[in-house]
Amino acid sequence: VQGPEARELAAPCIDESHREQALQLKPFTGMDSSQSFVARTGYTGEDGFEIMLPAAVAPSVWDRLLAAGVAPCGLGARDTLRLEAAMNLYGTDMDESISPLEAGLGWTVAWEPADRDFIGRGPMETLRDDPGKRRFVGLLLEDKGVLRNHQRVVVEGKADGEITSGGFSPTIGRSIALARVAAGDYDSAQVDVRGKLLNVRIVKPPFVRNGKTRIEL
């Protein structure tokens, strides 16, 4: 259950003895109740709850959420939200062959203390210090059209990258994408859309967070 009113609307569906505790949860924390696990987490860039509960009681909780005014949404809506929030999709934006440093996830690597050892530290340090490593960036389409996965990103006439996730952003009213591109100091590029080069601006993701645009249009 995600969105600005998610916790308020979902709270009545949580066991009364644990309801207040659930409402006090900090982001990225969770709690056990008598029949469920409630976490203040999500994959949308919005605030809210993720609730795990026995299958036998799920239909009644669903009905109560509907009665409270929660609107159902499908996978397409969820995927649009996570794209606006620039949240990686495994198998699309990253996999085992992609370093966190080339997936916009460098902040997850704990380099300190300097003697902290972990599997892959050596190669990752080499990549960290490599000025030629690929960049993981956001793209904002300046022309008419829609950006899609696997379209080629072209810089100065050369195919120098690929869109990993793309689509239309209802919040921004433009097409957006995540892409892995070649190193370099440039803030614009083109994308090959069915043989036609369309202009894009390179921006720092996320595009949207908590329903508010984070980039300059």
Which sequence ranges carry the predicted segments?
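Conserved, structured C-terminal
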Residues: 1-217
